[in-house]
């Protein structure tokens, strides 16, 4: 069997955020190795020794909080799937419809709270930090539930629902207004028969920087867009330094994030996957724990009997 060939980290920033891997890496990442272990006791031994832990999280973590994933057969908003709306072309063609979609998603988050998985991660970061150990979360989620749970060392590689970027001046700003603009009040209903609001572009969210007034867009990475090279540089540093990696609630099919954990595993670092099902990358990892993250993570990340807090 050929050894796994890892794409050089400098190439990661050149990859697109798509649903399929680049052709040159598709077969490399999914090579199957020995069946992973499901021994929590063995994982806990690795956890007890780890000084620099990276946790890569995906939609499965937030799904347990009731956050819509917009994936699979039921993943529709009106008659569209996320990949129909979360693109630069869709925004250029119909910014009103795209803003209705994101307004709906922002409003939904008002009633959602971090679950036991989010809380276990945040508590672990705080606890281990007092011991001089580092925990970093690299998330593909844009819902800010990790932040809400108390996670501080957080890299949101796909952006945030609660940040905007001006299409004219480029300013990125936090925005928690509800609604984000008056014209979106009461809009965004997800039912299939709902008609588009067709809001005039001048009434959509606008930049408040002096002298600008440009059209705002959600500060999220859309299909076909590159990830922020600065964030990916930070990701690369964390992946290169970690001595334990957890892959939590991610399908391992969205690139380039799907390459992160295999990159770590290839240098011999223990990687543990926590998911409700196996993924294309499962057999690349040392551990696999099947079940809801809100059930498996609290046990996995709980205080070890030999832990001491300075």
Swiss-Prot record:
Domain of life: Eukaryota
Keyword set, alphabetical order: Cytoplasm, Metal-binding, Mitochondrion, NAD, Nucleus, Transferase, Transit peptide, Zinc
Residues annotated as the enzyme's active site: 158
Domain Deacetylase sirtuin-type residue range list: 37-307
Cellular location(s): Mitochondrion; Cytoplasm, Cytosol; Nucleus
Location of the transit peptide in the chain: 1-36
Record flagged with keyword Zinc: yes
Named cofactor requirement(s): Zn(2+)
Residues annotated to bind Zn(2+): 166, 169, 207, 212
GO annotation, cellular component aspect: cytosol; mitochondrial matrix; mitochondrion; nucleus
InterPro entries named in the record: DHS-like_NAD/FAD-binding_dom, NAD-dep_sirtuin_deacylases, Sirtuin, Sirtuin_cat_small_dom_sf, Sirtuin_class_III, Ssirtuin_cat_dom
EC identifiers of the protein: 2.3.1.-
A Pfam family of this chain: SIR2
Cofactor binding description: Binds 1 zinc ion per subunit.
Main location class: mitochondrion
Class of this enzyme: transferase
Gene Ontology molecular functions: histone deacetylase activity, NAD-dependent; NAD+ binding; protein-glutaryllysine deglutarylase activity; protein-malonyllysine demalonylase activity; protein-succinyllysine desuccinylase activity; zinc ion binding
BP GO terms, sorted: protein demalonylation; protein desuccinylation; regulation of ketone biosynthetic process
Residues at which substrate binds: 102, 105
Membership in a protein family: Belongs to the sirtuin family. Class III subfamily.
Domain comment in the entry: In contrast to class I sirtuins, class III sirtuins have only weak deacetylase activity. Difference in substrate specificity is probably due to a larger hydrophobic pocket with 2 residues (Tyr-102 and Arg-105) that bind to malonylated and succinylated substrates and define the specificity.
Assembly with partners or alone: Monomer. Homodimer. Interacts with CPS1. Interacts with PCCA.
Xref: HAMAP family: Sirtuin_ClassIII (MF_01121)
Protein's UniProt name: NAD-dependent protein deacylase sirtuin-5, mitochondrial
Source organism per UniProt: Macaca mulatta (Rhesus macaque)
Lineage: Eukaryota, Metazoa, Chordata, Craniata, Vertebrata
